[in-house]
Amino acid sequence: MRRKKAKRMPVLPDPRFNSELVTKFVNNLMLEGKKSVALSIFYDAIDRVSDKTGEDGLEIFKKALTNVTPAVEVRSRRVGGATFQIPQPIRDSRKLSMAMKWLIGYSRKRNEKSMSLRLANEIMAAAKEEGATFKKKEDTHRMAEANKAFSHFRF
């Protein structure tokens, strides 16, 4: 056990939308410390979303994140030689980071030409409750539902 609780690092809002959420997303998107590249990918993706839908890109991004945010997850626990998948509620900060990481991960796996195009298409799909990221959330919830019987085991 640690002696003190870890301090949360302050997150500065991004320059264009003045949003901490965007900064957190860009920090997750960043590879090898290249923040300016990550920012341009994100802004390009948001612009593409706005152009294709005719609505505010940031609002669609927020809607997409809300749609792919999980409420419960399963965690493995050994009880008497057997490993059980136990459903657990997720705290808010972890929900958000899981949603962001899923959105970025499944965007990277898509087959479009540029990362900004992949991200834009995955955001639009998630906003419409489709796509690989939304499927991942549904699968997570399905696993938790299937293992509801073991929810009396606690950590």
Question: Which residues fall in each region the model found?
Answer:
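Strongly charged
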Residues: 1-32, 36, 43-155
